[in-house]
Amino acid sequence: MKKPLKIILIILAVLVGLVAALLIWLTATQLNVKTETAVVTNGENSTASFAPGDSVSILTWNVGYAGLGEESDFFMDGGKQVRAPSKAIVEKNMDGIVSTVKELDADFTFLQEIEADPSTRSYGIEEAERMRTETGLDTAHARNYKCAFVPYPIPPIGKVSSGIMTLSTAPIASAEPVQVAGIGGQPQALPDAGVYRPRGHGRSARARQPPPGGV
């Protein structure tokens, strides 16, 4: 075998090995939707109570990880940007999201695509934690998308840890995520379902978040 050909084959073998190692690593670190649990936190502002037959107000909102505002030109919508132009813009968007949630003051708020942990596309901003602390409401949060590194496009999306959050003006006693079938019968990546019971005595109440794209 000629030396140039041998070098080319070695380089190709190394590249194939690196790609295989990357795929194995991504598979090993991806979110296991069957074992994901919802995290419940309690806030001082969740003091409401509901009786059977009461009407409740609901806000459902895909916040787009606070990175898809008017300044963004997202590549999956035909644009050129992978993430918002700057961390300051994501902070501004989060300010607006928190302000709107507080202003509308719904009994139950269902948020989709809110970062559970620091992610590359949102410049490491802890969005779920901001929502908890700044609203002071009881919350239930579960991840539905986690990847240590999304290798596309160029530049790559990078680390993502995103989820679905429910905020309640009434105290949350418990919550659980429920996996449902998605489009074409494929499993969804853990649409969140919050299960709530009033503290103390009384009939149980349930607030379930719809799957992404649902109503």
Regions found by a protein language model. Give the residues of each.
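N-terminal, active-site-proximal structural segment of metallo-dependent hydrolase catalytic domains
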Residues: 3-133, 137, 141-152, 156-161, ...
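Active-site catalytic loop in hydrolytic enzyme cores
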Residues: 170-209
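A broad, low-specificity signal marking well-ordered, structured residues that form hydrophobic/aromatic
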Residues: 56, 165, 201
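Intrinsic low-complexity, intrinsically disordered segments enriched in polar/basic residues
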Residues: 2-3, 199, 213
